[in-house]
Amino acid sequence: MKLLLLLCLELTLVYVHAEEASSEGQNLNVEKINGKWFSILLASDKREKIEEHGTMRVFVEHIDVLENSLAFKFHTVIDEECTEIYLVADKTEKAGEYSVTYDGFNTFTILKTDYDNYIMFHLINKKDEENFQLMELFGREPDLSSDIKEKFAKLCEEHGIVRENIIDLSNANRCLQARE
């Protein structure tokens, strides 16, 4: 009987540890996303936006959680040089949604995170009467497991983004040398 109780306790602890959060759910603790991140995968239904020289091909360095907003420090490659970009995204009236102006008007949500390893974003960009989707997978380390990458790919498909439009940045020039 003691062994059975111990097994139940262990399974409960494993379940609690493996629990994921999203900004659409009630269990997101946004404070826990504060800190250093690396861009791992980018996906879009407009692939040219995330290819080399695409306006949305940015590489995250840090997320700062502010009172009613999130501040992002990104890098991008312009004329073969790494350039810093600082963006502040404000909470919208919709629960779990943020907005920021960059190459158009963007709204985004956090689809999934486990805080310690990865975070997945879904963004909708509106510019000049046109819309496109962007999805991002960030990791706390420069690369992530194939299981997490597959989970991201399935989420992309659920949002109508084909696998051919997912770019793995783990071997790309992500301006790592420009990080502090």
Swiss-Prot record:
The keyword Secreted applies. It comes from the Eukaryota. Pfam families: Lipocalin. GO terms for molecular function: insulin receptor activity; pheromone binding; small molecule binding. It is found in: Secreted. Residues 1-18 form the signal peptide. Keywords: Behavior, Disulfide bond, Pheromone-binding, Secreted, Signal, Transport. GO terms for cellular component: cytosol; extracellular space; nucleus. Major urinary proteins (Mups) bind pheromones, and thus stabilize them to allow slow release into the air from urine marks. May protect pheromones from oxidation. May also act as pheromones themselves. In this context, they play a role in the regulation of social behaviors, such as aggression, mating, pup-suckling, territory establishment and dominance. Belongs to the calycin superfamily. Lipocalin family. This is Major urinary protein 5. It comes from Mus musculus. The gene is Mup5.
